[in-house]
Regions:
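A solvent-exposed, acidic/Ser-Thr-rich amphipathic alpha-helical stretch
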Residues: 22-79
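Short acidic-aromatic low-complexity motifs
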Residues: 1-31, 62
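A short, polar/proline- and glycine-enriched secondary-structure boundary/capping micro-motif
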Residues: 45, 93-95, 123-129
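Short beta-strand segments enriched in hydrophobic/aromatic residues
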Residues: 28, 87-89, 119
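Short beta-strand edge/turn micro-motifs at domain boundaries
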Residues: 101-126
Length: 130
C-alpha cells in the first residue's frame, strides 16, 4: 500500500507540472476542506475537491504558469502529514519567495480530508495574491 508521503510526492509532481486535476485525483478526498489563511481575496475555507482545485487553478492563472514548488521536508504520522515546501512565483514583475507549511489530515481511503496551509510570510503571500 502506498504511504501518505508517497501519495503527496506524486501530487506535488503533478502540481509542479501544472496538472491541477491530477493533484486533486491523487491527493484530495471528494469532501476535502482546505483552510487558506490571511487577508487576501482567496482567504477562507474551500469545501469539496472542486472548490480546492479552483483555488489552485487560480494560482496558476495568476502566475501564468510561473508557480514553482519544491518539497523541503515531509513528516508523516498515523493520520497526519506535515509538508514544508519552498514556493516561488512571478506575476507582473513581482516575485514571491516563501516557505509554506501544509498540515493534512488523511482519511481511511488514503486521501486528504482536511488541509491547512500556513506561510512563513503571510503578508507577502496576501500582497502577491491581492
Amino acid at each position: 500500500m502506498q504511504t501518505k508521503s508517497e501519495r503527496l510526492g506524486q501530487a506535488m509532481a503533478a502540481i509542479s507540472r501544472g496538472d491541477v486535476q491530477a493533484f486533486g485525483e491523487i491527493l484530495l478526498s471528494d469532501d476535502v476542506v482546505w483552510h487558506w489563511p490571511g487577508r487576501s481575496s482567496v482567504a477562507g475555507e474551500y469545501r469539496g475537491r472542486d472548490a480546492a482545485l479552483e483555488l489552485l487553478s487560480g494560482f496558476h492563472r495568476l502566475t501564468q504558469g510561473r508557480l514553482h514548488v519544491e518539497s523541503l521536508n515531509v513528516l508523516e504520522g498515523r493520520d497526519h502529514v506535515m509538508s514544508f515546501t519552498h514556493v516561488t512565483a512571478q506575476q507582473d514583475g513581482r516575485e514571491l519567495d516563501v516557505v509554506m507549511a501544509d498540515a493534512m489530515r488523511f482519511g481511511a481511503d488514503g486521501r486528504v480530508e482536511e488541509f491547512w496551509t500556513l506561510s512563513n510570510d503571510q503578508e507577502a503571500v496576501d500582497s502577491f495574491i491581492g
